[in-house]
Amino acid sequence: MKRENIKTILLTVLVVISLVFTWGIWTFQPNFSEGSSSTESTVRVKHKIEKTTQKLSETVRPRDMFIHDDGAHYKVDDNALYEEIWSDLPHWDVKGIKDISDQYDKAGFKSWFYGIGGSEAKLDLQFSDTIPIDIFQTLFKWSNQSFEYSSFDHILIPFNETKANKKIYLVSYSKQLILEVTVESANYRNIMNDLKNRQSNMPAFSLFSIGSKKEFLLPNKPLTMDKKEFVTESIKTNTFKQALFSDPSIVREDSNYNNRNVLTDGISRLDVNLSQRQVQFQQRNLVQSTSYQTGELIKKSQKYLEDTGSWTDHYQFFNINDSQQLSFYIFMDQIPVINSTAKPFGATSAITVQWANDDILSYKRPNYSLGTNPIKTSETELMGGSEVKMLLSKQTAYDTDKIDQIFLAYQLVSTSTNDDPLVELEPVWAMKVNGKIVPITKDLLRKEGANSGVE
């Protein structure tokens, strides 16, 4: 065989071998065993504080429900009935929207709202803050219609709707803004009949004038409610670390603090204050966003609380302040839980959230959960409307003309030392005044200035 032929054959073999090796390199896929470090470095299971999930319709809901019937007012105090009403509303089909605010002057609006002077009786769903229209659009079966961006703090549902298409109303009481919404509901008649049949057993309320400008719905007689005692369960710092940091493996603890666990990854900072029972997670070098509408902030916060598993108790959206800080309060028996000003249980009883565009700027919350089962209950009597009015007229800590809301609440009362997990939930009247939530108790008579309260 000639030398040239031998060279050609060898060259061909080398080319084939090279192609085989190249193909092997390009198609090779490593088979890491389960639990290997390589797999863990590329895919991290997202941890949550609590596995419980919560829909937007469970986070944004009315604080109170009242029936207004020819000048009489009744509070819907049956939790099962409340749930029946609120869970059915998302199934109502919205057929049309119309602004009818111009139909009423100031006196006519009040008569229409409260069912006075021949106006039809209505069910009133009251929210603790104004809710943007795009949130209602998300909650209900609502087609994409053009509308002016507005917010509402009431849904009114008339009792005497007999047509197939019913009328309900989104109302901003302070602005006297009324949006008439035409809906179709298969269960409307059953719900409204059930309410009407139970109305006589509901506690009766009246409008009480407090200060020189406003009226508030308060009970005609003292109310009997349950005082409850709970053993709180502390949530471990490591649980917050795993849920809140994007990469917990690079987080380091700062040991220069007493009775506090402070952790950072260089960008974010987690501060767990054990004596104050408070957790704060902050992002550094970010500026608070002021460009978002309230509806967007509620949706972003809902997603963040869902993604981090923040539903350690049943939290509901409560309000948003002028700094665009959103507050979510624990609700027990559909009643908000606030902190006592005289004997507070830690520094906060709410989750607060602030945003810097698409990044969380600040997340603050309690480091414990209450649970749902009290270890002890006992009956207690709550002031009637006349007593509430008299107490507020005697106190000098707050200007009664600055009161925005008065509502039922549970206040968290510390029963002993800072380390004791026992806490008492005491029924109390509360007011929103000067942007703060303040319990209405006889402690007000001993205050000289309006420096206490929960923002």
UniProtKB/Swiss-Prot annotation:
Give me the Gene Ontology terms describing cellular component: plasma membrane
Keyword entries, A-Z: Calcium, Cell membrane, Membrane, Metal-binding, Transmembrane, Transmembrane helix
Q: What is the reported phenotype of gene knockout?
A: No cellular levels increase of either WalK or WalR. Induction of WalR-dependent gene expression. Cell wall defect.
Segments on the Cytoplasmic face: 1-7
Q: Please name every pair of cysteines joined by a disulfide bond in this record.
A: none
Q: Which domain of life is it from?
A: Bacteria
Membrane side Extracellular: which residues? 29-455
Instruction: Tell me where the transmembrane regions lie.
Output: 8-28
Q: How does it sit in the membrane?
A: Single-pass membrane protein
Q: Which GO terms describe its molecular function?
A: metal ion binding
- Where does this protein hold Ca(2+)? D69, D70, G115, G117, S119
Against Pfam families, the record matches this protein to: YycH (PF07435)
User: According to its UniProt record, where is this protein mainly located?
Assistant: membrane
Function of this protein?
A: Together with YycI, regulates the activity of the two-component system WalR/WalK.
The free-text domain remark for this protein reads: The transmembrane region is required for the regulation of WalK activity.
Subunit annotation: Homodimer. Interacts with WalK and YycI.
Which protein are we looking at? Two-component system WalR/WalK regulatory protein YycH
* UniProt gene name: yycH
